């Protein structure tokens, strides 16, 4: 069993270290992660310059690129044998609803899925990071389940774990993505050089957080597991747009 790990918070992130430690012993664990924090990088690839692959004292490999770069490089150019599963995380902060479009954590797992490898993105639903051990244990249980009962087709799972102790988790729920309200406006500030600068605003609050959503599950103390797909076709609008074009 070969397990490839990546993230978007960078190879130095405590969530990645906790994940690697938790999965140790389940197989050969290889870590390839960004050199810097690349949160919000989505599925971007670096096409305007070469990528450098280096090895840290921890044994983790790091790349001067995006999370997608890391997985793509590892799978198509670095590893002599394909990983059996890819796990991305543990992200500091939730990746629910619309977050999945922007998330580098989800993107790393998505790249694995596109390359035909079962992939999991796992995030902790706060920015405090008090309970990485809980999310790490959830990740181990999912990988153990995969080892015992492999899924016949590549799968892409988005997992969100409440930032509480493992004993306080209520269980797991398979969910759909909820929706957020539109993001908060950018924040305008003056730099020390008296330049006007802008920071991207916070994500919008939950708009669709009803039963069955990822938002609803984690709010009630459950681990949310959402199977994702790549097809962005709005099937319900096909006939409408077809008529509109005539």
Swiss-Prot record:
Gene Ontology, cellular component aspect: cytoplasm
Catalyzed reaction equations: a ribonucleoside 5'-phosphate + H2O = a ribonucleoside + phosphate
Classification via Gene3D superfamilies: Survival protein SurE-like phosphatase/nucleotidase (3.40.1210.10)
EC number(s) given by UniProt: 3.1.3.5
Keywords tagged on the record: Cytoplasm, Hydrolase, Metal-binding, Nucleotide-binding
Annotated localization: Cytoplasm
Highest rank taxon of the organism: Bacteria
Keyword Transmembrane helix listed: no
General function of this protein: Nucleotidase that shows phosphatase activity on nucleoside 5'-monophosphates.
Name of the protein described by the UniProt record: 5'-nucleotidase SurE
């Amino acid at each position: 069993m070969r397990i490839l790990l990546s993230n978007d918070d960078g190879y130095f992130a405590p969530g990645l270290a906790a994940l690697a430690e938790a999965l140790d012993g389940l197989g050969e664990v290889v870590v390839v992660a960004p050199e810097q924090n690349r949160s919000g990088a989505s599925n971007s690839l670096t096409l305007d310059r070469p990528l450098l692959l280096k090895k840290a004292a921890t044994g983790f490999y790091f790349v001067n690129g995006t999370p997608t770069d890391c997985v793509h490089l590892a799978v198509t150019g670095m590893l002599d044998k394909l990983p059996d599963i890819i796990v991305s995380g543990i992200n500091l902060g939730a990746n629910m609803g619309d977050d999945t479009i922007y998330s580098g954590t989800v993107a790393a797992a998505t790249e694995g899925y596109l390359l035909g490898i079962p992939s999991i993105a796992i995030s902790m639903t706060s920015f405090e990071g008090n309970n990485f051990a809980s999310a790490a244990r959830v990740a181990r249980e999912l990988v153990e389940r995969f080892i015992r009962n492999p899924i016949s087709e590549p799968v892409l799972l988005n997992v969100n774990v409440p930032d509480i102790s493992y004993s306080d988790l209520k269980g797991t729920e398979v969910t759909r993505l909820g929706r957020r309200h539109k993001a908060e406006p950018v924040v305008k500030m003056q730099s020390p050089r008296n330049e006007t600068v802008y920071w991207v605003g916070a994500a919008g609050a939950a708009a669709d957080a009803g039963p069955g959503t990822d938002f609803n599950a984690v709010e009630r103390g459950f681990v949310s597991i959402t199977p994702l797909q790549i097809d962005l076709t709005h099937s319900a609008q096909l006939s409408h747009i077809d008529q509109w074009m005539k």
